[in-house]
């Protein structure tokens, strides 16, 4: 009787693993259209003119990788580390950083998240889930090593805001004094759970499901496979964007599945700004 139950459980597990592998190996579906969903054609401020942006600097991560950032000095003592959204990099927030620094509000750091332009060995991937949090902790250690001791705000837009929330709920939750969240992405929240950001983000749902099954039983060797693609029309690409994310990068870039706990960890130390189309 016991042997029969063991065989039955083994058969069910084998079927589950085979199904997961089948879902994972299915190719990424093509993006259905090349619509300019974010209005790149009318946005003259996304990429500032060459020469107006601070030079790329580097800081050492714990694995020895030199990760890219831009620094905007200021007379203010407050430090803002502001994380970019999906696909692009810190330079997209040049105007925000320049205005804050010139006004004496904050010294601003714009990191290029690992797996993006000039940061990391592989575009669209990291080495393990949680590496982006470790990278931000290493950036803060670098900042403090430069003698900058002011209050530190961790901020971000879109996925970058999601990463800030994730940091708050993790082992590096003491990094920041406060948080600045601009339309943060929380994938499992009711407002985004079933959406694709207006056609911007295309998720390979079957592959994601298969990887979730494998990760649940401790199989992580396929986490480097891409699961999401971004719909940036070719006419508006400049070669510095990242057009797909692996499972482990995408997971690292957003709050945990229990996102309420990550949000709760911020307490009342955050400012949330959300706009609309008006």
What do these predicted ranges mean?
Residues 126-145:
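Alpha/beta-hydrolase active-site loop
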Residues 266, 272-275:
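Short beta-strand/loop motif that positions the catalytic acidic residue
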Residues 161-173, 179:
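Short glycine-enriched nucleophile-adjacent loop
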Residues 2-60, 68-70:
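An N-terminal hydrophobic leader/cap segment in hydrolases
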Residues 86-98:
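The serine-hydrolase catalytic nucleophile loop
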Residues 180-190:
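Active-site nucleophile loop of the alpha/beta-hydrolase fold
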Residues 77-85:
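Short beta-strand element of the alpha/beta-hydrolase
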Residues 100-121:
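Conserved alpha/beta-hydrolase
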């Amino acid at each position: 009787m016991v042997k029969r139950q063991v065989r039955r459980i083994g058969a069910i597990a084998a079927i589950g693993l085979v199904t997961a592998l089948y879902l994972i190996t299915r190719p990424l579906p093509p993006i259905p259209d090349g619509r300019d969903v974010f209005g790149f054609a009318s946005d003259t401020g996304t990429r500032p003119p060459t020469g107006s942006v601070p030079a790329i600097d580097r800081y050492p991560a714990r694995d020895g990788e030199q990760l890219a950032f831009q620094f905007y000095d200021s007379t203010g003592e407050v430090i803002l580390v502001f994380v970019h959204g999906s696909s692009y990099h810190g330079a997209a927030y040049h105007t925000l950083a320049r205005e804050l620094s010139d006004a004496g509000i904050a010294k601003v750091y714009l990191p290029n998240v690992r797996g993006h332009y000039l940061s990391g060995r592989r575009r669209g991937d990291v080495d393990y889930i949680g590496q982006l949090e470790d990278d931000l902790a290493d950036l803060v250690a670098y900042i403090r090593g430069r003698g900058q001791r002011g209050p530190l705000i961790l901020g971000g837009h879109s996925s970058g805001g999601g990463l800030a929330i994730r940091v708050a709920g993790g082992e590096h939750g003491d990094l920041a004094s406060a948080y600045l969240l601009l339309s943060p992405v929380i994938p499992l929240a009711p407002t985004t759970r079933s959406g694709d950001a207006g056609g911007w983000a295309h998720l390979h749902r079957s592959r994601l499901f298969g990887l979730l099954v494998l990760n649940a039983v401790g199989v992580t060797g396929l986490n480097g496979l891409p699961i999401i693609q971004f719909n940036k029309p070719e006419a508006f690409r400049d070669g510095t964007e990242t057009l797909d994310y692996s499972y482990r990068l995408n997971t690292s870039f957003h709050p945990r599945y229990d996102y309420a706990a990550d949000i709760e960890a911020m307490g009342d130390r955050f400012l949330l700004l959300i706009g609309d189309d008006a």
